[in-house]
Amino acid sequence: MAQHDFVPAWLNFSTPQSSKSSTATFDKHGEHLSRGEGRFGISRRRHNSSDGFFNNGPLRTTGDSWHQPSLFRHDSVDSGVSKGAYAGTTGWHGSSRGHDGMSQRSGGSSTGNHRHWNGSFHSRKGCAFQEKTPTEIREEKKEDKVEKLQFEEEDFPSLNPEAGKQNQPCRPVGTPSGVWENPPSAKQPSKMLVIKKISKEDPAAAFSAAFTSSGSHHANGNKVSTMVPSVYKNLVPKPAPPPSKPNAWKANRTEHKPGSLCSSRESAFTNPISVTKPVGLAAGAGLHSPKESPSSTTPPIEISSSRLTKLTRRTTDRKSEFLKTLKDERNGDCSESRDCDKLEGLRLEGSHTPEPKENGEQGCLQNGLSLPMVEEGEVLSHSLEAEHRLLKAMGWQEYPENDESCLPLTEDELKEFHLRTEQLRRNGFGKNGLLQSRSCSLSSPWRSTCIAECEDSDSETSSSQTSDDDAWK
């Protein structure tokens, strides 16, 4: 039986230069221990490979290269004995390999390789396999070395770097061999489960999780190639259904990318926000929710950029319209204000219908809305005497007992009227003397008609005109 041959070869391999007596005693001691522990070690270590390896204490320094291959498939003797439950186990393992350095260089890894590929369930057989002569042992060693050369290229890149290390952090990163077709450890599947949980919480990485889960099933022998597209997918979420090959996926990405960048270049000068959107999407920021993503990523960007450009154009148009209205008001303030004053006078004359009142309010409101709010505060700070003088000059009576149909002005109407007068004063009349005289000459006939209809004397009109001039100044 092939399993019987490797027990003496494995036990005596590391001690060809040392005394045979010490190894014989340690071999017997170890075999007695392993016979009781063998089956329990196999059944336990088949599912949990890293438990005994991390807990074996002082065996870690010399025995990593020797323990390592058996950790991947089945740890029959090493796990059961190296748990530290027996006092003599540490001495047996340490001395059988410790007084000779060959296990660290090539001896330990090569013998472990034999056990790794031939499945040495030697712990069930007991001490009966020790009765072998050294010649048989050396012949078996030669056969094992021939077998070792067949698998050296595959296994040694992953086994030799780990042999020199004291811990086992990069064991899952090893290049694929026959061991990974049926992984015994529960750590690699749990790693993939963690990725799935994260992807469920994060909607941007949902497609990447589906890709990694599918890749882990059909590419168990190629862990490195499946992890690279999954990370790449996490960085750049794409709506297309994830293909199994990363090359096709990259081609998909190049198809989608130019459209989004072109849409950003179109609106780059009008809207700086849309420039950052496709760049952020290519960099991995999940800007689009899964609802938008099934169609493609470029249309939402184009839609949003066009919306933003439309909004910015509208706002600029409003601003330009506002500036135009301001210029028109400064040029035609006299005519507009005179129209407003005419409507006020007509309302107070005798035709007290609600229509001219509404028209007057509308005219004042249209002109007053375009004014800045700073002037409003300045208007409210003026004295009441000047306002009353203006109203009297317009023909307004403080105590309208004479005319029963005359409606008193409300506070809102007064405020609007003061706004218009203050604007006129600031724009043209106070600055330019020509405009002032012209306005007085133009507005005087309206005042005279209003006052005549209100049954006022000529002296009162002259006094009102002088007071009005003082108020304008």
Swiss-Prot record:
Organism: Mus musculus (Mouse)
Biological role stated in the UniProt entry: Possible transcription factor.
Biological processes, Gene Ontology terms: DNA-templated transcription; positive regulation of DNA-templated transcription
Family: Belongs to the vasculin family.
Modified-residue entries (Phosphothreonine), positions: T298
InterPro entries on file: Vasculin_fam
Skewed-composition ranges (Polar residues): 14-25, 103-112
Biased composition (Basic residues): 113-125
This protein's record includes keyword Ligase: no
Record protein name field: Vasculin-like protein 1
Keywords for this protein: DNA-binding, Nucleus, Phosphoprotein, Transcription, Transcription regulation
GO molecular function, one term: DNA binding
Predominant localisation class: nucleus
Location in or out of the cell: Nucleus
Biased composition (Low complexity): 292-309
